[in-house]
Amino acid sequence: MKTPRKRLGILVGGGPAPGINSAISATVIEAVNEEIEVIGIYDGYEHLLQGRTDMVRPLTIDVVSRIHFQGGSILRTSRANPTRHPDDMQRTLQALQALDISALVTIGGDDTAFAASEVANASNGVVRVAHIPKTIDNDLPLPGGVSTFGFETARHVGTQLVRNLMEDARTTNRWNFVVVMGRKAGHLALGIGKAAGATLTIIPEEFPQERIRLNEVSRMLEAAILKRRVMGSEHGVAVIAEGISEKLDPEELASMPGVEMVYDPYGHIRLGEIPLTTILKRQVQDHFAARHDKLSIVDVTLGYELRCAQAIPYDVDYTRTLGYGAVRFLLSKPEDGR
């Protein structure tokens, strides 16, 4: 007979990504099979850092056995940061203790990973933590050739959408500018642009300098449009990584009409609040207007449509392995204070 263990908690932080529910499902199934009680914590650290213990739910195999097919997160998610203030961390630890949680699985990106590490350190070994890396941006330092979960599904869905936009551009004989989520990294934009066969794709990694001017980007787009005209085509699709916004001079960006610099709890600019496609569209149209040349451009932003898509088999398979592995790690003998 196995010795009863304390509870294992699961929470999700950061933005949604396809495969979260699959990771939750696999974690719960393996934990329950090891006779561990599992508690799902709603909204990341949002309630824990307030010391609240009521925003939780028991997770059983019956609850999670089919959720691996679903997009989104049954535990929802948030960007609440327990490391901003010592009192927040203290309340988080007190809440975990009150819930009798001695093992914690966190699912999230680099910010959630950092918070998980800090929770583990601050607990002095009382709470052991396993982190499952998640982001559609594919910007975490994983082994070479290994993508973050959710990336392949996001690329798959994004490619289908851009393919539709390419046909729309051809049919209406105009240009579409498509900004794709990805924060500082251009992996998702490049993956979608290459797979869809977009006319051009612009990513921040193309620019070695720390800061660039908006005019550099708009002139690249203008040049592509002119080259297409020489080739006899008046239409095209440009895919642009949202990380371009982080390369721009903040003062120049803030001076643009309709731009408000908003920051999340981890201190990052909310790139989704910056209308990059609209800004680039206006500037490129101004370049052509200076030559008395009218240009029709449609601006589109892709990101929120991708984050809660139903995971493709690759990501379902991948996340089930990650969830299983997280529990096996927590059951293993601690080494070097892990």
Predicted regions and their residues:
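Short, ordered loop/turn segments at secondary-structure junctions
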Residues: 13-15, 41-47, 79-80, 109-112, ...
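Accessory alpha-helical/coil subdomains and C-terminal extensions
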Residues: 95, 103-108, 114-118, 122-128, ...
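N-terminal phosphate-binding or glycine-rich loops at protein starts, especially the Walker A/P-loop
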Residues: 2-52
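Short beta-strand elements at the ligand-binding edges of bilobed clamshell
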Residues: 140-154, 303, 309-313
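C-terminal active-site/capping subdomain that shapes the small-molecule cofactor and substrate pocket
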Residues: 288-338
